[in-house]
Amino acid sequence: MAARKETGNTAPIAETAVKQVQIDGLVVLKIIKHYQEEGHGSEVVQGVLLGLVVDDRLEITNCFPFPQHTEDDVDFDEVQYQMEMMRSLRHVNIDHLHVGWYQSTFYGTFVSRALLDSQFSYQHAIEESVVLIYDPIKTSQGSLSLKAYRLTPKLMEICKEKDFSAEGLKKANVAYEDMFEEVPIVIKNSHLINVLVWELDKKAPVTEKHELLNLSSSNHLEKSLQLLMDRVDEMSQDIVKYNTYQRNVGKQQQQKHQYTQRKQQENLQRLSRGETPLPEEDVNKMFKPPVTPSRMDPLLIAGQINTYIQHIKGFTSQNLGKLFMAEALQDQTN
């Protein structure tokens, strides 16, 4: 997973550090090319975003990929690789300010603990950092899917304190809707590129417009539903584990209470016989409390479930619209 070397000087968290992300068209093409060359199936590709901050707008002007490597490549130093790349870009007078990272996704699967830790590391070091999520499957169906996300101030505070217990999340009032905030994206090209795109569009052959009504998302919908069911199963298992923890805590509290009562009765009997009462013992040392499970993983699972649901809603609404348009065209031909 992408990592960012933290620095000692970090600015305080602002409510709206970045209100808009402006991306050069070249960066978008580099991200797409990176996945086409190295991404296969569910394999994730990642890279570094470079640019600068202008007021409340983050301008991403360049990027470079992380090379594919395995855990066995002990000689590969990711931080050293980033520093060498940034020094090389500085020598050729290219923007080299580290402003975030990008990652591809497989059927919208990106809400994970690894992404949370990486984005926290970036955002803690550089306040304006964002993560770009590129969906190649949705893009292959005709619409570019590229979104920018940041961790919310609430989640940043929780990650700093590292209190992922149920009480800590409840105290911070953090739900799955409060984990990530989406930042609007604007893709910018130079005037020469815009003219070239206009000329290419004029020269492009006219395709059959009825192809737009093709319901080609059945496989995508089936896979999204399968992934959704898997996450729901994970959530169900986690609920069972947490309920077991709560029962164990209740049993232990009852055992502590029974032990304390027995100890008091025994001391009263010893005093009535004129004997010295037994010394007091630390009950908490005698009864080791159960390990409190982290509630961050269920929160992330809930966020991923919500992402799948939004994707499914988008595809089903598109298909319903296509069905209505196809019906209208059929009525006209008849």
Swiss-Prot record:
Protein name: Eukaryotic translation initiation factor 3 subunit H
Gene (name only): eif3h
Record keyword tRNA-binding present: no
Chief location: cytoplasm
Organism of this sequence: Xenopus laevis
CDD domains for the chain: MPN_eIF3h
Family label: Belongs to the eIF-3 subunit H family.
A single GO molecular function term of this UniProt record: translation initiation factor activity
Role this protein plays: Component of the eukaryotic translation initiation factor 3 (eIF-3) complex, which is involved in protein synthesis of a specialized repertoire of mRNAs and, together with other initiation factors, stimulates binding of mRNA and methionyl-tRNAi to the 40S ribosome. The eIF-3 complex specifically targets and initiates translation of a subset of mRNAs involved in cell proliferation.
InterPro entries (UniProt xref): eIF3h, eIF3h_C, JAMM/MPN+_dom, JAMM_MPN+_peptidase_M67A, MPN
Signal peptide positions (record): none
Protein's GO biological process: formation of cytoplasmic translation initiation complex; translational initiation
HAMAP family assigned: eIF3h
Pfam families with a match to the protein in the record: eIF3h_C (PF19445), JAB (PF01398)
